[in-house]
Structure formats: structure tokens, C-alpha cells
Swiss-Prot record:
Name of protein: Renalase
Signal peptide: 1-17
Cofactor(s) of this protein: FAD
Source organism of the structure: Mus musculus
Gene3D superfamilies linked: 3.90.660.10, FAD/NAD(P)-binding domain (3.50.50.60)
Function: Catalyzes the oxidation of the less abundant 1,2-dihydro-beta-NAD(P) and 1,6-dihydro-beta-NAD(P) to form beta-NAD(P)(+). The enzyme hormone is secreted by the kidney, and circulates in blood and modulates cardiac function and systemic blood pressure. Lowers blood pressure in vivo by decreasing cardiac contractility and heart rate and preventing a compensatory increase in peripheral vascular tone, suggesting a causal link to the increased plasma catecholamine and heightened cardiovascular risk.
Recorded name of the encoding gene: Rnls
Protein's UniProt keywords contain NADP: yes
Length: 342
């Protein structure tokens, strides 16, 4: 039985795992490792520690799909819509700049439900808090080691973490990356920002006419979401959840600051925009070091093959463009090259 490892439990990784299970009919062990404590990557959904049913999307807020991708990725959208994983965005967003023909979608159960759906389809054995540090070539297999010192061997490895984290890996992989590939990986750049989820008491109302609001000139906050309102899941059993995301300059300026200090600043700034908000019952602050791809690999190949036999390939939106469709395109590119060589 072939052993396959996918590194990264975001959209690209989970979709690669699901497509592998679908496309490869031979017996297959499929493992998926992520260094974080939860699945989702940049589509993570946080839960209130007081009520797990009260959730907030700390990463992706909604999906925008152009007419081109509505057609190109039609099967993926139809499947997710049919299962209720995605639904059309119907609540008002103040300051949103859309293009004619664009469709917008939200995930009623939070965007991590998309990842959970694909992981369930894949049947992968998911291991969290598995931070890959080394990849060695041994006996025509990949020996993958973590920061705890544990190591396992695989016949095929797919890396879907951000490009800077690929370049940090040690072992034989260092010499397998060509100079051109190294320069391409170094050319990928990301924006950084913070997100803060705030959970409020049951019965509290936030009296604004919008579900989300973009702020064009605020020095700290660029986006506010009344998250349960955005997803159209307002309930008498859950209090409202609010997500605020910072501007990129603020994120860069405070990248090394403590999350507690950043959270305090963000709440102070929120009070100037929405005065009168009561104290939340719980808060969750998240630093996005790699928030969105601002510059991807040139020509956007969708993947980067580092070794053929055994197969080692990189995927992710750093090889396409930074959004939902970029991740789908990358997963499809990875599968295309895999089917060609295995």
C-alpha cells in the first residue's frame, strides 16, 4: 500500500487529499499533517469557549467568484452548494467593491466546514501539532521528521504550506530545490494582519444596518463583520460574534508585539467605530503572518515539482493567486502532474 503525506490542513491540502482519494483507485494510506492545533489554515473558524455553537470566521470572510471561475470550477461550487456547505451571500456589505457578474458565497457553519467536508471525503488520518522540520530521501522513500523528533516514511509527499516555510525545511530537500526554484519561492510575498473574534452575551443586539463593513482610511481596522449576521445564522441560542481585521500596515508594524497588546489596541479602535458595545464574554486574537499572497510565483504554474521518483511536489495559492479559486486551481494542477508521473 502506497503511503502519501499531505502537509497543510488548509483548502489546497484538504482538496488535494480528497482528489487523491477519488482519482487513485489502488490501496492508499493518506496522512495529513498540520503544525497548528486546528484544521482550516486561512479558512479557520473559531468557537466561543463558553458556547461551541457560537463561531466566528477569523480568516476568509466570504468567497467572490468571477463568471470565469463559476464556469471553470462549476463542479466544486455546485457540490458545496448542494450540501449546504456554501450559500449565496445575501446580507449587505458596506464598502464592498465588486465587479459585474461576480457571485459571493458564505459558509453557514463557518469556512472550516469546507475543509472538514473535503477531509471527510479523503478519509485521511489527520495529525495536528505536527510541525514538519526535515525531509530526507531514504531507500527511495521520503522520511519526514517533525519538531518533536518523530519521523515517518512516505512514497509521495505534497507540501501546501506558505513558500517561506518550505524554504525553512532542512534535510535532503535543501539540495533538491534548484536555484531557479529557490528564487521563485523567495519571490512569493504575503501581507500580514491580525484578526480578532469577539463573542457576546445571548440576546445582545448590534444595531447596524450592515453585516460587514470595509473601512478605507482607518489606521488600524480595515474590516468589521457581524459574523452570525453575515452568515445569516442569527439565533436566540447564541449571542452575536464580531470579527475585526487590521490593515496590513498595522499588522506589519505590530508583527512582533504580544497578542494581548494588539488585542487591547484593536478593541480600543473598535470602540471609536462602534461606540457603546458591551464587553465581550470571550475574545480570540489571531496573527496572520501569511495573510494573503501579494506576489505569487511568476507564470502561476499552480504547483512546483521538486522530485519525480519518489514524488515530492509543492502546491498552494503562492503558485496561483490568493483566494478560494486560486487554491482550487493549485490542487487541480498538483493532481494533473501527479497523474502524469505516478
Amino acid at each position: 500500500m502506497s503511503r502519501v503525506l499531505v502537509v497543510g490542513a488548509g483548502l489546497t491540502g484538504s482538496l488535494c487529499a480528497a482528489l487523491l482519494r477519488k482519482e487513485i483507485t489502488a490501496p492508499l494510506y493518506l496522512g495529513l499533517w498540520d503544525k497548528g492545533g486546528d484544521i482550516g489554515g486561512r479558512m479557520i473558524t473559531a468557537s466561543s469557549p463558553h458556547n461551541p455553537r457560537c463561531t466566528a470566521d477569523l480568516g476568509a470572510q466570504y468567497i467572490t467568484c468571477s463568471p470565469h471561475y463559476v464556469k471553470e470550477h462549476q463542479n466544486f461550487y455546485e457540490e458545496l452548494l448542494a450540501h449546504g456547505i456554501l450559500k449565496p451571500l445575501t446580507s449587505p456589505i458596506e464598502g464592498m467593491k465588486g465587479k459585474e457578474g461576480d457571485c459571493n458565497f458564505v459558509a453557514p457553519q463557518g469556512f472550516s466546514s469546507v475543509i472538514k467536508y473535503y477531509l471527510k471525503k479523503s478519509g485521511a488520518e489527520v495529525s495536528l501539532k505536527h510541525c514538519v522540520t526535515q525531509i530526507h530521501l531514504k531507500d527511495n522513500k521520503w522520511e519526514v521528521s517533525t519538531d518533536t523528533g518523530s519521523a515517518e516514511q512516505f512514497d509521495l509527499v505534497i507540501l501546501t504550506m506558505p513558500a517561506p516555510q518550505i524554504l525553512e525545511l532542512q534535510g535532503d530537500i535543501v539540495n533538491l530545490i534548484s536555484e531557479r526554484q529557490r528564487e521563485q519561492l523567495k519571490s512569493v510575498s504575503y501581507s500580514s494582519r491580525y484578526a480578532l473574534g469577539l463573542f457576546y452575551e445571548v440576546g445582545m443586539k448590534i444595531g447596524v444596518p450592515w453585516s460587514c463593513r470595509y473601512l478605507s482610511s482607518h489606521p488600524c481596522i480595515c474590516f468589521i463583520s457581524i459574523d452570525n449576521k453575515k452568515r445569516n445564522i442569527e439565533s436566540s441560542e447564541c449571542g452575536p460574534s464580531v470579527v475585526i481585521q487590521t490593515t496590513v500596515p498595522f499588522g506589519v508594524q505590530h508583527l512582533e508585539a504580544s497578542e494581548a497588546d494588539v488585542q487591547k489596541l484593536m478593541i480600543q479602535q473598535l470602540e471609536t467605530i462602534l461606540p457603546g458595545l458591551p464587553q465581550p464574554v470571550a475574545t480570540i486574537c489571531h496573527k496572520w503572518t501569511y495573510s494573503q499572497v501579494t506576489s505569487s510565483v511568476s507564470d502561476r504554474p499552480g504547483q512546483m515539482t521538486l522530485h519525480l521518483k519518489p514524488f515530492l511536489v509543492c502546491g498552494g495559492d503562492g503558485f496561483t493567486h490568493s483566494n478560494f479559486n486560486g487554491c482550487i486551481s493549485s490542487a487541480l494542477s498538483v493532481m494533473k502532474v501527479l497523474k502524469r508521473y505516478i
